[in-house]
Amino acid sequence: MSVSVGVLAIQGGFQKHAEMLESLGVEVKLVKFTNDFDEIDRLIIPGGESTALLNLLTKHQIFDKLQDFCSQNPVFGTCAGSIILSKGSQYLSLIDLEVERNGYGRQVDSFVTNLGFMGNSIKAVFIRAPKFTRVGDNIDVLAKFDDLPVLVRQGNILVSSFHPELTEDSSVHKYFLNM
């Protein structure tokens, strides 16, 4: 069975996710309209600017369709995508996670570090990254930085505060594809 992965493509860094998935031989659909959800099995919500993304979701009238899709299918949110999916936000509230926007600093504070993930070391790029300030009891913490979670999963939802698509390492995307 082939899997078709959608990448929400109305704002933010969607192209790098699409390129990473294509390098893995995955069929990619750039999601811009409500009917695009009918053609995909799972979805990536990329980084970008969460307030701008919310405004565009509302303007393009896809917020409700996005919420419905994300509640039933595997979804991966990176950076702003994690904010959109988190509880305590005015967004989708689909994962028991609270975040602090720009918790790791402003653009000038961006950094690259190595993280432990599934027994291996992966590179992680943090750009105006959210800090995960509270994780629910039913959350699986998959990677930490400075003893704080930065990659977590709850059921069908995977979120990272960093940008795995900006590295050569496809481990996190492969994990998502196997959820």
Swiss-Prot record:
L-glutamine binds at residues 48-50, 101, 127-128. GO terms for molecular function: glutaminase activity; pyridoxal 5'-phosphate synthase (glutamine hydrolysing) activity. The gene is pdxT. The active site is at 79 (nucleophile), 163 (charge relay system), 165 (charge relay system). Its EC number is 4.3.3.6, 3.5.1.2. This is Pyridoxal 5'-phosphate synthase subunit PdxT. The keyword Hydrolase applies. Pathway: Cofactor biosynthesis; pyridoxal 5'-phosphate biosynthesis. SUPFAM superfamilies: Class I glutamine amidotransferase-like. It comes from the Bacteria. Pfam families: SNO. InterPro entries: Class_I_gatase-like, PdxT/SNO, PdxT/SNO_CS. It catalyses: aldehydo-D-ribose 5-phosphate + D-glyceraldehyde 3-phosphate + L-glutamine = pyridoxal 5'-phosphate + L-glutamate + phosphate + 3 H2O + H(+); L-glutamine + H2O = L-glutamate + NH4(+). Belongs to the glutaminase PdxT/SNO family. Catalyzes the hydrolysis of glutamine to glutamate and ammonia as part of the biosynthesis of pyridoxal 5'-phosphate. The resulting ammonia molecule is channeled to the active site of PdxS. GO terms for biological process: glutamine catabolic process; pyridoxal phosphate biosynthetic process; pyridoxine metabolic process. In the presence of PdxS, forms a dodecamer of heterodimers. Only shows activity in the heterodimer. Keywords: Glutamine amidotransferase, Hydrolase, Lyase, Pyridoxal phosphate. One of its GO terms (cellular component) is glutaminase complex.
